[in-house]
Amino acid sequence: MFALLCAAAFALPARAGNGVYVSTNPNGANAVLAYTRNVKNGLLTYVGRFDTGGRGLVDIGGAQSHAVVATRTQLFVVNPGSNDFTTFALRDDGSLLFMGVTSSGGVRPVSITVSGNVIYVLNQGQLGVATASCNGFTLGDDGLPVSIGTYDVIYEAEAIPTDVFFTRNGARLVVLLNGSDAIDTFSASVDGALTVNRRLAGVSNPVGGTMSPVQPFVAFAALDDDTTPRMISIRATGIALPSIVSSAGLASTISPCWAAATPNGKKVWSSNFAAGSLTLFAGKLSGSIQAVSSYVPASSSPGSLDVAVDQRGKFLYRLRAFNS
């Protein structure tokens, strides 16, 4: 059951599996809802609810992306109400095995990303109470995260970070800063070390993004700009400052907040909260995007949240608020 309190968070494991996972994020005990997916027609079957051992926080209000992330064998989910995140093992039947809870190293964790054995958690912080931070972890032999500590990033008070993710090859870490109107990129090593913070400034209201599945240094970001809401593609080589490759949107691209791409990178979608719509972009080998069309439901009410694409690029899944 997809309810209003579901966080903006989908996860489809990086394997030829059939699981779909959603974080509930209520003001109380947090949980992950698990579904199995019919690979032929895409339909979902409910598996069960799995408590994270942490707490959600409705005050986040959807200002987050990638609150759940999965590898071939594990799933990780943030608990913004208890300042920690949970590790699960993935079972063959789509169910989850609780492994443990780890402190996020900050306040209000809203996003999480993993590359190899390295995890970074984005803590949104709380204005006047705690600063935002991006905290690194490595997976131990027991499969549980251990804090790196040395490479934690502390942000300015007004940053309001909403999303963190690695690029395709894990060589760049991308952080979207909604309050600072900026996108940060870091060079990342296989042991989790971060160097060379490069900032792309003047990017109005970035909320959610995704990596390019084919270009190692290209990422996409949805900009909830009051004047020109749109999707942008950026290039972050780590040598020069990150730059905007292209920018595109349609009249129905109102309040774009989340993004997803097919495995071949030829299709990119933005999920547009205010319009309740989806915008399709054509992805080019150069890293540029071009707006193609929009899916606008019969009801014009808001509520389009996170989106995810299956591993074959055949099915798109969208989380809807205000619907069950």
Residue ranges of predicted features:
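Beta-strand-rich domains and repeat architectures in extracellular enzymes and scaffolds
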Residues: A16-R37, F50-T73
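Conserved beta-propeller blade signature
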Residues: G19-S23, Q74-V77, V118-V121, R172-V175, ...
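Short loop/turn segments immediately following the C-termini of beta-strands
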Residues: N25-N27, R37, P80, Q124-V129, ...
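Structural motif
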Residues: A29-L33, D84-T86, V129-N135, D181-T185, ...
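Short loop/turn segments immediately following beta-strands, especially the blade-tip
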Residues: Y35-L43, F88-S95, G136-P145, T185-A193, ...
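A short beta-strand motif characteristic of beta-propeller blades
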Residues: T45-D59, L97-S103, V146-Y155, G192-A201, ...
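Beta-rich, blade/repeat-based domains predominating
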Residues: G53-T71, S104-V118, V153-R172, A201-A219, ...
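Asp-box/WD-like beta-propeller blade repeats and closely related beta-sheet repeat scaffolds
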Residues: S95-T167
